[in-house]
Amino acid sequence: MSLEEKVAQLFLVQPEAIVDIGTATAAGDATKQAINKTPVGGFVYFSDNLQSEQQVQDMLRNVQKYSEDRIGLPAFLSVDEEGGTVARVASTGRFDVTDVGDMAKIGASGDVQQAKQAGETIGSYLSELGFNLDFAPDADVLTNPDNTVVKKRSFGSDPRVVSDMSLAVAQGLAQHQVYSVYKHFPGHGATVGDTHQGYAYTDKTLDELKQSELIPFENAIQNNAAFIMAAHISAPRVTGDDTPASLSKTMITDILRGQMGYDGIVVTDAMNMGAVTEQYTSAQAAVKALQAGADVVLMPEDFQEAYQGVLDAVKDGTLTEQRINESVTRIVTVKVHM
């Protein structure tokens, strides 16, 4: 792979980021040409992209073929399908699928089997449509009862319950060859603020996080999680500054990889969110995420700027090609098993 191809693999974008179209609902010649020019690592789809079963199947099948033809690897075809509040497929009413409901309800039941069944149900219909990656489960421990961001999405306030149920959802998805992304490291359940809008932080120390928020992620790592999402949450009492976890070498390289022993793929939360765009350009944020140890940059506000920014950073020595190669190796290792 050329440097340009390797860097392209580090990005997971909406189809509209590479094809000049309002809302992508098909993948034809324009998509093929765009992938040939910049073979990105994958795509993330939202409800507007998803109109009917046949339409989604055709679109994703074409994208997969273009990607394989261009670079010899499948694309990550992803969606946010947690169930309930966040369900890009089930919430539309356009698909004959079961909405499994909010994870808070399943958590309150205390029945791990329900979580496994939810994962199987979601995995079944996502796989049928052509998706191979789901931004779920939500592994956040709801330790701040005033947190409305993940209130319905979290399995609750008991780290053991969240841990067991997150794993069960992931296992259910895996039965249908759908990879899961545990989110939002280091835990969105204790935070004040909403990263979609702007700055959000936890005032916990590392020891405090280890006793609660990090437990589900430790369990995921012990069970060979392939993907963990790093959130745009600042943890000033851990890192000593306001850098979001998604851009923090302390959080990703030192803690998640070093102390917790994780060697899977780290994907950032969406880089078009306020917590990032208020502070950084698309290029700065992408470079900073990779310097921190992330592997996949999700949805930069301006993809072309972010992509060029990473290429420039390698060329001027800000990023080493070895750092790029480490991430590409992790990505390819998962893709060859898809």
Feature map (PLM): residue ranges:
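Alpha-helical scaffolding within the catalytic cores
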Residues: T25-K32, Q211-E218
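Enzymes and membrane/adaptor proteins characterized by extended Gly/Ser/Thr/Asp/Glu-rich
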Residues: E16-A24, A34-V162, H184, G189-D203, ...
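Short, well-ordered coil/turn segments that N-cap beta-strands
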Residues: Q9, G41, I71-A75, F131-N132, ...
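Mature N-terminal segment immediately following signal peptide/propeptide cleavage
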Residues: M1-I18
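Mid-to-C-terminal alpha-helical segments outside catalytic/metal-binding sites
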Residues: K315-M338
